């Protein structure tokens, strides 16, 4: 029984020598439906690494299943440290096109999921900030209302007492001053009146 062979020169054959390539996963095995001439014309798709992980799995464990169902070979290279990966699709041209469409549809689907997740997170942040602002405004209004009530209570309790005390003091002072001012005049008038009466009275002679 023949041992399945690999393609040790696949990356060297299809990639420029100057391009730094990090191979992710193993080189594909040869299947009965795969012909060596398919290595000459690969289709290339470039995606973010996180999308490649979503589509094929973190360890590329879904690649064998896709290869068997689509009768193509898939090889993934990481081209740069910024998170971009290159997917090489080998096989019949029609199968290559179908596989690339499937990959791009899955990539769009995962992008939409991420956008929805980001939108929900943003909406939650906005709602939290609005709640904090409303809570702060409510606390400020309540504090202001309480202070206004305290001020009104202090004013209501203090003002009548002070007014009554002030009025009483003013009345007593006015009465004292009035009595003091009128007493000498009244006394003088009384003395003068009595003196006049005594003068007008007839003198009884013996």
Swiss-Prot record:
Pfam families: MOEP19 (PF16005)
Chain positions found as Phosphothreonine: 145
GO CC list: cell cortex; centrosome; chromosome; cytoplasmic lattice; mitochondrion; nucleus; protein-containing complex; subcortical maternal complex
Cysteine-cysteine disulfides: none
Ranges of Basic and acidic residues composition bias in the record: 144-153
Main localization of the protein described in the UniProt heading: cytoplasm
Compartments reported by the entry: Cytoplasm; Cytoplasm, Cell cortex; Nucleus; Mitochondrion
Gene3D superfamilies per UniProt: K Homology domain, type 1 (3.30.1370.10)
Residues in KH domain copies: 40-103
Region (Disordered): 144-206
InterPro entries: KH_dom_type_1_sf, KHDC1, MOEP19_KH-like
Annotated region (Involved in RNA binding), positions in chain: 1-40
Compositionally biased intervals (Polar residues): 166-183
Modified residues (Phosphoserine): 171
GO BP of this protein: positive regulation of dendrite development; positive regulation of double-strand break repair; positive regulation of double-strand break repair via homologous recombination; positive regulation of neurogenesis; protein storage; regulation of protein localization
Record-stated family: Belongs to the KHDC1 family.
Function per UniProt: Component of the subcortical maternal complex (SCMC), a multiprotein complex that plays a key role in early embryonic development. The SCMC complex is a structural constituent of cytoplasmic lattices, which consist in fibrous structures found in the cytoplasm of oocytes and preimplantation embryos. They are required to store maternal proteins critical for embryonic development, such as proteins that control epigenetic reprogramming of the preimplantation embryo, and prevent their degradation or activation.
Quaternary structure and interacting proteins, as annotated: Component of the subcortical maternal complex (SCMC), at least composed of NLRP5, KHDC3L, OOEP, and TLE6. Within the complex, interacts with NLRP5, KHDC3L and TLE6. The SCMC may facilitate translocation of its components between the nuclear and cytoplasmic compartments. Forms a scaffold complex with OOEP/FLOPED, and interacts with BLM and TRIM25 at DNA replication forks. Interacts with PARP1; the interaction is increased following the formation of DNA double-strand breaks. Interacts with NUMA1.
Entry domain remark: Contains 1 atypical KH domain, which is still capable of binding RNA.
Name assigned to this protein: KH domain-containing protein 3
Protein's organism: Macaca mulatta
Name of the gene: KHDC3L
């Amino acid at each position: 029984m023949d041992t399945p062979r690999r393609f040790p020169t696949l990356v060297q054959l299809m990639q420029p020598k100057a391009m730094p390539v990090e191979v992710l996963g193993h080189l594909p095995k040869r299947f009965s439906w795969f012909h060596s001439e398919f290595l000459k014309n690969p289709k290339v798709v470039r995606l973010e690494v996180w999308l490649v992980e979503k589509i094929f799995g973190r360890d590329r464990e879904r690649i064998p299943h896709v290869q068997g169902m689509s009768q193509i070979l898939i090889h993934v290279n990481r081209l740069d440290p910024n998170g971009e990966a290159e997917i090489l699709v080998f096989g019949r041209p029609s199968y290559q096109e179908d596989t690339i469409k499937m990959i791009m549809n899955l990539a769009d689907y995962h992008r939409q999921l991420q956008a929805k997740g980001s939108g929900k997170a943003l909406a939650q942040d906005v709602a939290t900030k609005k709640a904090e602002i409303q809570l702060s405004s409510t606390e400020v209004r309540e504090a202001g209302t309480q202070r206004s009530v305290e001020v009104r209570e202090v004013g209501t309790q203090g003002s009548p007492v002070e007014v009554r005390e002030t009025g009483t003091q003013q009345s007593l002072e006015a009465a004292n001053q009035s009595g003091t001012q009128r007493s000498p005049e009244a006394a003088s008038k009384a003395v003068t009146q009595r003196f006049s009466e005594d003068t007008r009275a007839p003198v009884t002679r013996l």
